[in-house]
Every structure is written in structure tokens, then in C-alpha cells.
Amino acid sequence: MMSANTVAKVMIIMLAVCLLTQTDGKPVRKRAVSEIQLMHNLGKHLASMERMQWLRRKLQDMHNFVSLGVQMAARDGSHQKPTKKEENVLVDGNPKSLGEGDKADVDVLVKSKSQ
């Protein structure tokens, strides 16, 4: 067995080591500025990629809509009527054609043009 003197010395040494290091459960070293900048850049990159994927999906939806043969309105504000009713069908298969809008739809379109 160890004597009480030896146990006391070991306890004092361990107490000194614990008090002098003062880690308190924190990381031993702080992150360097370059690591923080790297994490910031990674976050910005991921957000940018997410926005690009969202935009790509929206553009793909628009491309699919246009590729069905639906004629778009001219930029000068005049509207073109499609030649055939089959060309005027919505993408999701809704039988209501684009030319046959509800009164609420027409009101929304008129309000959006005035802005």
C-alpha cells in the first residue's frame, strides 16, 4: 500500500496540474482566423448553391411550360391569342384553358399590370 505521504503528494501534483491548465472543458486551442473564414465561406457557398438549384428548378419549370407550345404575350403589352385551343392547356392537365380566366384571375392580372 501507498503511504499517506505519497498519496498527499500525488493529490497536490494533480491539483496543481488541473489548476494551471485551466481548460474547464473548453478546447485546448482557439480556432485560427483562417478556420473561421473557411467555415464562413462554406456557409455562403452552400447558400449560394441552394439558391442556384432553386433558380434552376424554376427555369426548368418555365422551359417545360414554354416547350408545350403555349404562346406568350408580347413585351409591348399586346396579347396574342393562340390559334388552337389545344395549345392553350395548362401544364398540370387542368382542362381549363388559359384564355378562359375567372374574374378573380383577370382582376389579379389587371392589378399586376398597373404596377
Curated annotation (Swiss-Prot):
Residues 51-69 are annotated as: Important for receptor binding. Transmembrane segments: none annotated. GO terms for biological process: adenylate cyclase-activating G protein-coupled receptor signaling pathway; bone mineralization; calcium ion homeostasis; cell-cell signaling; homeostasis of number of cells within a tissue; intracellular calcium ion homeostasis; magnesium ion homeostasis; negative regulation of apoptotic process in bone marrow cell. The gene is Pth. InterPro entries: PTH, PTH/PTH-rel. Coiled coil: none annotated. Belongs to the parathyroid hormone family. It comes from Mus musculus. GO terms for cellular component: extracellular space. Residues 1-25 form the signal peptide. Highly expressed in the parathyroid gland. Also expressed in the placenta, thymus and testis. Parathyroid hormone elevates calcium level by dissolving the salts in bone and preventing their renal excretion. Acts by binding to its receptor, PTH1R, activating G protein-coupled receptor signaling. Stimulates [1-14C]-2-deoxy-D-glucose (2DG) transport and glycogen synthesis in osteoblastic cells. Interacts with PTH1R (via N-terminal extracellular domain). It is found in: Secreted. This is Parathyroid hormone. It comes from the Eukaryota. Disruption phenotype: Mice are dysmorphic but viable. They display diminished cartilage matrix mineralization and reduced metaphyseal osteoblasts and trabecular bone during the fetal and neonatal period. Fetuses show a hypoparathyroid phenotype, characterized by hypocalcemia, hypomagnesemia, hyperphosphatemia, low amniotic fluid mineral content and reduced skeletal mineral content. Mice lacking both Casr and Pth survive to adulthood with no obvious difference in size or appearance relative to control; they however show a wider range of values for serum calcium and renal excretion of calcium. The keyword RNA-binding does not apply. GO terms for molecular function: hormone activity; peptide hormone receptor binding; type 1 parathyroid hormone receptor binding.
